[in-house]
Amino acid sequence: MPQPKQRALSREIILSTALDLVDEEGLSALSLRSLGKRLGVSQAAFYRHFPDKAALLEGIAEQVWRLTFESFLDRVDTGAFDPESTPTPTVSEPTEDAPASPLLIYMRTYAHCLAQTLRSHPGAVMLLLTHPMSTPEQLSLLARVFVTLARHGFTPNADMLGLVNAVSIY
């Protein structure tokens, strides 16, 4: 009788399984051995995709940031902003009664998306606190956010990365 065909091990499968493990058992339970056991492979199989555990942790953080930014981009594109904020941000001249630009609305919406992602993946909270956005993929995701905001009439400035990091850590 032929052996069942094993699915090919890919970076995406490893990261998805690792995030599931972190969600179910916590970050401290993640090891190459425990991940290998879940996937039915040896520890050595991971070194094709990640040079070490630190790179695996960066990849998991990247995946959580991706989920957050994709949720945020979806809300911006559909106009489904945080219910506590104004329904639709508009770019207008500030007045005494309305000094805020859409920045506050976007930041609240981003914070809401991040909180929603972390509620879905509570084991990743500590990981994000110790792995701020820094990889090329993470910065590419952030660039997509800035491009989308610009398409909607908001021009991000050089301080935006610091602001996004501040909201993320808060």
Annotate each predicted stretch with a short phrase:
Residues 1-34, 38-41, 51-55:
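Basic, helix-initiating cap at the start of DNA-binding domains
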Residues 12-20, 24-25, 55-75, 105-113, ...:
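Alpha-helical structural segments
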Residues 28, 151-157:
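Short, charged helix-capping/linker segments at alpha-helix termini
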Residues 44:
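Key DNA-contact positions within bacterial/archaeal DNA-binding proteins
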Residues 63, 67, 152, 170:
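Phosphate/oxyanion-binding loops and surfaces in catalytic or ligand/nucleic-acid-binding neighborhoods
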Residues 70-137, 156-160, 164-167:
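Hydrophobic alpha-helical connector segments
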